Structure formats: C-alpha cells, structure tokens
Amino acid sequence: MLIGFSQVYAQTVSGTVQSATDKSGLPGASVVMKRAASDAILTTSTDVQGAFRFERVPSGNYTLEVRYLGYDLLSRPVQVAQAPVVLGVLSMQEQNTRLGEVQIIGRAPLGEQKGDTSQFNAKAFKTAPDASAEDLVTKMPGVQVQDGRIQAQGEEVRQIMIDGKRYTGEDVTSAMRNISSDMIENVQVFDAQSDQAAFSGFEDGNRLKTINFITRKDRRQGYTGKISAGYGTDERYMAGAAINYFNNDRRITVTGLTNNINMFDFSIGETPGGGMRGRRGGWGGGSPTGIINTNNFGVNYQDKWGKKMDVSANYNYTNRDIVNDQYRFRDFVSDEAGLQYTEDSNNRDREDGHRLNMRLQYNINQNNRLLVTPNLRVQNDESFTGRNARTFDLNGTLSESLNRASSDNTTFNFNNNILYSKRFGDSGRILTTNFNTSINNVDGDGFQYEQTQNFENADNNVLRDQFIRLDRKNFSWSGSTNYSQRLGEKSRWQLEYSIGNQMRDSDRRTYDYVETAGEYADFNMPLSSSFKSDYLSQSVGPSYQYRNDKTRLQVNARYEYAVLDTDSQFPVDLDPLKRKFSNFLPSAEYEFKFSQSQNLTLNLRTNTNVPSVEQLQEVLDISNPLQARIGNADLEQDYQTRFNARYRNFNAETNRVFFIGMFGTMTNNYVANSVYTTSAPEGLAEGYEFRPGARLSRPENMDGYYNVRSFFNYGQPLNFISSNFNVNGSVGYSRIPGKIDGQVNYSNNTNLGAGFNISSNISEKIDFTVSTFSSYNIVSNTLRTTQNNNFFNQNTSLRYNWILWKDLVYRTELNHQYNSGLSAGVDNSFLLWNMSLGKKIFKDKQGEISLSVNDLMNQNVSIRRNITESYVEDVQSTVLQRFFMLTFSYNIRSFKGAPAPDENMQRGPGMHRGGRPGMN
C-alpha cells in the first residue's frame, strides 16, 4: 500500500545551473538530491546548457546539492508533493579568495571523482597552443597510447562525446585529433551505458569506455581547424586539412588528407614529418608497418532538428596503397626438437572504401523515445603476396616453398538498429523494444601459385596453379523486448525476452590451370566447398536492481536455447546437421561508493558465441602450403565468463589519483587449434599431401582457456618542477589450450609490466612528456617444457615542444625500444628520432613554416612477437625511415566573443584567477 501510494505521487524535478557572474550555463555539474528522512539519493549531471532533470522522484523532503569545479557548493531544500517541481535558474558563486588587495593565486585543481566518472580540469594540464585533444588527454592520469590506440584506466577508449553528445563514427583517435585542446574545459572518463541500458535503466553488460569533452562556453560558436601542406626528400608529400564549425547544437567537421608518409588521418595538433601523432603505432610504439599512401575525406555532422530530433552522421572515404615486406620466424611446439619455420614475404594491398554512420533520436514526448542507427560500409580490397618459406630442423632444410597469391574482393556491410522506449507516466513502468538487421556480403576471386621443393623425396615436389571464386552472404536479425517495474524507492525488476537469427551461405570454388586448354578449367573438388549455416537463439529471464546513496546492485538470470543447422554440399555431400544448445546465463554488477571520490565496481557476465562460417566450413585453405588450414563442421558454441573489478580514488584536495582494475575471461568449449604435423585423420583433408615440416590446423572445442590481467595507475602533481607524475603497472596471465598430433598442449604466458610518465605543466611555451614502460613475458608450454621463449621489452619516449625566441618553435620526439630474447635475425633495439624547427608567421601567429625530419638516425624498425598454443613467432616488417620535409601550416581559430589567440598564451603556469578554473 505504501509503495503504491509513493509511486502515484512520484514527480519530476528540473532546473538550470548557471554562473552568477555571466549567466552562462554550467555543463557537467554534479546534481544530487538527498532525502531527509532516509539514506535515499538521486544523482545526475547537467547538459551542455546547464539543464538537469530527475524523473520519478517520490514525494518527500530533499536537500539538493550542486557541485562544479571552481564554484562554491550550492545547497537548497526541495519539497516534492503532487506536482512537478520546476526550480528555475540556480546561480552558483565563483570561488574567489582575497586578502585585502592581494589576490591568492593557486594551482588549478586537477579534477574530481563523481561516482564512476573521473573528471579532469583541462587547464591543469598545459599543452602547446596548437595542441589537439589527444595531446591533452595523454597527459592525464590513467590515459596512454598503446599500439596506436587510446587507453584509459586499462581499457581501450571506444567512444567520444562532446558536451554529452556522441561523436558518430568508428574512429575514436581521429575524432580526438580534430578537436583543439584550447576548446576544452573539462574531460570526463567513464563507462557509458549502451543505448538499450540507457533507455531501460538496466545494465546489459555492453558498457563502453568513453571520454566526454566539455567545451568552454566561449568556444561553442565559431571555427577551428588547421591546413597543412609539405614536400620532402624521396618524393615524400603531404597535404591535409581539418575544419570544425560550431554553432551551439550544430557542429560540422570536414577533413581531407593525401600523403605517402604513413599518416592515416589528419591531426590539428601535429606538424607532419616531425611528429607521430597522425600515425598508428606498432608494437611498443613506432610507425605502422609498410609504406602507405593514403587519400582520405570525411564529414561529421551533428545537429538538433527542432525541439525533438537529435541527428548525427559521419561519412568517410579512404583510398590506401600499402607496400610491406616482412620477415617471419616461428619456433614450433613439437616433439621434433628444433622444428622451425622462416618466411620472407612481400605484400601489396590496395583498399578503397566508403563508410556512412548515422544516429537519429526522436524524443516523441516526455514518455516516448525512438532511436535509429543505420551504418553502411562498402569496400574493395586488392592484395598480392609473394612468399618464400622454408621449414627446417636440427638436421637441415625439410622443404622450401615459393608461392604467390592475389585476390580482388568487394565487401558490402549494412547494419540498422531500431530502439523504442515507452515510460508509462510516473508509474515507474518502462517498456523497451529493439530490432536489428545486418547484411554482410563478400564477393571476389583470386589466384594462387605454388612451387614446393621436398628435400626428403623429390618425387613429392608440388607445382600448383589455381583460380578461386568466393561468394559469401551473411544475413542476421535480432529483436528484444524488456519490461521493467519499480518495486519501491530503491529497487526495480525487469523481464527480458530476446531472439536472434544468423543465416550464412559460403560458396568457394577452385579451378586448376589446364596447360593444354590455356585456362583454369579443371574443377578441384577437395579445395572447394558449398556450406550453409542457420543459427537461431532465444533467451528469457528476469533482472533485479537495488540502489541507494552508496550501493548499486543488479543481478540477472537468463535461460538461452539455441539451434545450429549446418548443410554442406561439397567437397562431401553430408546430411544436414542439427545441434541444440541450452545454457543458463547469470550476470551481476555491484558498485559501492565509499565517498564522492572513492568507488568500487564489480562485474560478472556470461555469454555464448557461435563459430564463424570460416571455422565451420570444411574446405582446405593452402594459400600458405606449409601452414594449411581446414574448418570443422562439428564445432559447438563456446561459453564465456567475464569478470572485472575496478577501484577509483580521486582526492581533489591533494590532486592525487589512483585507479586499479582486474579483468578476466574464462571460456569453456573454446575454439582452439588442433595441429597435425605428419599426417591427418583419414578423410580429413582429402587431396592434401603433407610437405616435410608443414602443419595442418583444424579448429576444435576445448576447455581450459583463461586470460586474466590487472592494471594500476597512481598520479599526482610534482609542484617543484610544475609537472604531473604518473606511475603504472600491470600483471597478466593467459592459458591457451590446443592440440599437437592429438596431444593436449597449454601455452602459458605471464606478463609483468611497470612504467612511469612525467608531463610538464609549466606553460604553453614549454611542453614535454617523458615516459617509459618495461615488460617481461614468461612463456611456457606443457608439451615442450625445455623450450625458452621468455622475452623482455622496454619502450622509452620523450616528446618536447619549445616556443623559442622570436616565435621559433622546436619540436622533438624520441622513441627508444629495447628487446631481449627475440629470435636471431630480428633487430633487438632501435632509436626513432623525429624533429622539426618552425617559425610562427603572420600577425596573429597562426601560420607556421617548419623543416622537419622523420627518423633522424635511420634506425626505425617494426617488431612484433606473437604467442599461440602451437608456436611462438617474431615478425619484422618494413617501416618508413628517414626523410626531410618542408611544411606550411595555418591554424584556424575564430570564435564569437573569444580573446585573440596570442592572449590565450599569456596565462601563467597552471594558475587561475578565481572564477572558473583557467579562465580570465
């Protein structure tokens, strides 16, 4: 009775938070409602205009508290009765401490922890005047670049927001490179809910690590961007531009790039040739592999159509030509001592693709919302690989293979998701429905030529010349319905039903070259396959959620029933195979807030995965004849359990930050590789003759896969050198099951890593970052226990920007990599040194002419170690080496009501004068 009475009188509470000084809205402010008679608490944050809204607030007396960096706490009582509460404008007073006529000036606060959101004050991290958002965030605690990708708190950043609105598109790094750092007031790092979870209010396990950039109020109307062009030695060239237009809700970004210096996208914070930020790093830093010519054009659009429609879209065209030579060394896990494999290959790839992503959200009314997110990708790939490979043991060479392979494939991918949510007034009931469709087709052809010499028996030498035709069609759809109901002030329950269907049809036909006919006319049945699969899954189950001011708990229990139908017509016409699966899929999430600055989150999820058509299709792939592969139509779905634990502590008074996290995965029925080295079971690979030292791999379900890793970061200011200091470390362990000639092998890899980072906070004229990270890997196998593949890797880097006398700008970047324990023939260490000297020109200093050098020492290399259940390999690839380039760049900065660019360079080192942090 009491619960029902409370629900009847649940109301909305809304208002707008503004600065008392200039009446501007304060975005990202923390708004909390505490109930006077209990420990119940409600939290939210303001949008880009400073507005906030609480839904379904039970009647009673509350205390409303608003917090914002650089402002005094605002607190006021609020009474909720039988009508919506409109608080109107809430004005916050700036913090401004004076002693007589002497103003107290201190270091800008680093930020604060707001629940599970880490918020950083951008002005507490000094960057160069023309820096990008990427340059800014990589100075912040827990944020780093790993293998060319941005990571935050140990996880890859998967989504970018600007003032709380999602940046539509697939490339997170590109988005950050096109936002100037001087536009940003605060940076928020958090795990964003999926659209489904945000609409329903229940977690679905699909959170994405997200960075939200809250822009300065004087940077929301105007233009920003950069135009650059350069030419250098060895006919190296680059021309690119990025232009951003901002008019409050409307935001348009246009980018273009053409170059042959391995830049994949344009960055407004980079001087091409003298920096690496426009490129994608390889293992341990360094350049991307190969010599890459890229032509790229993109448009990003975001707007609000009327009062109810939010629209965003992203279009990208990319044309890329890649030339890459590689050396590969493999040390096999085998009963044959010293069995190894080497390969020299030259690779040529041409890519031509279009991508279109859209997001349309229609807020029909207060209780109904509709979200449509279509995505389209069309791509053509042409590739050529020439490979010279050999296998050998302690007695010498066993076989040598020369083969060439070329292909021309066109991929069409379309995905559309429709999400609808309905709230039944203030009753607390919510209905959410979701429907998704996906089409993924691949159409292409290719040629393969092989000449293999058998050193044990010349009669078994192989000469092969073939044409291959591929036609693959995949169509899938899925839908779900969720109904949730409030049980009281602190708890809710939900019932969910979902259904999905994946239909895949793969047809691969191989023809041998007939010398007398002069064409590819002889159909090769063993190397051809026609295969279909149909996977239908359904699940149903309840969820329960409880929350108060300190605790959030959610538990889910789903029952899943699935059917997998497969049908193979050739190489062997098999009867259709039907397999049925039933699983119990529990999940749970727990969060405890020790205080506003400390919280702990625990998460457990389970799910199943169906094998891919490539894994199911029993067709022999001998594109690399010494490393052949074949599918397995008897594969079953795997069962995966994932868990993670995170603890965050952000002390705003001392500016000390601490994160620690643990992430783990355990998989039953893991799709492992079963490797055959001498002969395969009868009928498995008809028509294939084993070359000496060759291997045939086939997927097989096995238990015993584990992957556990942990990460920590501690950061604090070093005031005596006006810098920020971060120390981080990691511990990881993985166990990968597999089979070698029927014997079970577990590949165990333990990884230990530690490093530190010091980034300057002196002024915009001096900007440096020094970092180092070392890792040691212990690799062991249960079959070959004497094999030692342990290795050590250390990467140390320095980035330094200095605005000298008379507007001269010096930039340098050093990256040193040291490796120990790699195979012979692979470079153990290198020093990559990029440098530029530029001169600011024009009255407003927005132009620059610079002379830069890439890889001054001409030592750059790319090295990668891969660890599997059947071998350990080292790969060294072609990289771009030394060249010089003369570049002209022009920075575009024009904002309504903003100070001139040179005025922005006059702020002191990490200081602010009252008011909002870092603002004059």
Stretches found by the model and what they are:
Residues D344, S476-S478, D522-S529, E636, ...:
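Outer membrane beta-barrel strand-and-loop segments of large Gram-negative receptors
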